[in-house]
Amino acid sequence: MSATESSSIFTLSHNSNLQDILAANAKWASQMNNIQPTLFPDHNAKGQSPHTLFIGCSDSRYNENCLGVLPGEVFTWKNVANICHSEDLTLKATLEFAIICLKVNKVIICGHTDCGGIKTCLTNQREALPKVNCSHLYKYLDDIDTMYHEESQNLIHLKTQREKSHYLSHCNVKRQFNRIIENPTVQTAVQNGELQVYGLLYNVEDGLLQTVSTYTKVTPK
């Protein structure tokens, strides 16, 4: 183990093997049992009843844990750049399962700053992807690249790449949020007062969430 690895704050590394993974899991399970002795036997073992569907990017730096939750509270779906195409079968099935079957009453679409998918398009590196055997990733990022070009006039006023990346991350949450709230399953649940939808942006620099958009039933005055 190198000096860098020995001083790392992380549990596992590229050099970790199966034994390391199982040992880390055993330690985690023991710690969870010490913190919440009833979590596994009395709650998780008897099924799930999550209150929230969390849709996010597959980036390793954040997940539903940013909500401060325990296993069993949040149903999760993540993909590269948290893209939600309206006709995507996985998206539609996930929304149906979470809302109709699991009865969640909150859907969160959560993007994040410093997104690799966004930066790839912002820095025009997407065009090189097919040359390094990433032709599927090239095609997949078409939605982000389209957004990048749609926002080109607004990006002109931002000075740094960091500012532009942050702005596009914010735009991407709005973009995917607007698709989610057009989903029939979502619309029905919201209009019945059974669901709220939140668009959030996670900042990788401080771990905090920022509200981007909300969709709830409008109550007549």
Curated annotation (Swiss-Prot):
Zn(2+) binds at C57, D59, H112, C115. GO terms for molecular function: carbonate dehydratase activity; zinc ion binding. Keywords: Cytoplasm, Lyase, Metal-binding, Mitochondrion, Nucleus, Zinc. It is found in: Cytoplasm; Nucleus; Mitochondrion intermembrane space. Its EC number is 4.2.1.1. Pfam families: Pro_CA (PF00484). One of its GO terms (biological process) is carbon utilization. It is an enzyme of class 4 (lyase). The keyword Cell membrane does not apply. GO terms for cellular component: cytoplasm; mitochondrial intermembrane space; nucleus. The keyword Transmembrane helix does not apply. CDD domains: beta_CA_cladeA (cd00883). Its main location: cytoplasm. Its cofactor is Zn(2+). PANTHER family: CARBONIC ANHYDRASE. Belongs to the beta-class carbonic anhydrase family. This is Carbonic anhydrase. It comes from Saccharomyces cerevisiae (strain ATCC 204508 / S288c) (Baker's yeast). The lineage of its organism: Eukaryota, Fungi, Dikarya, Ascomycota, Saccharomycotina.
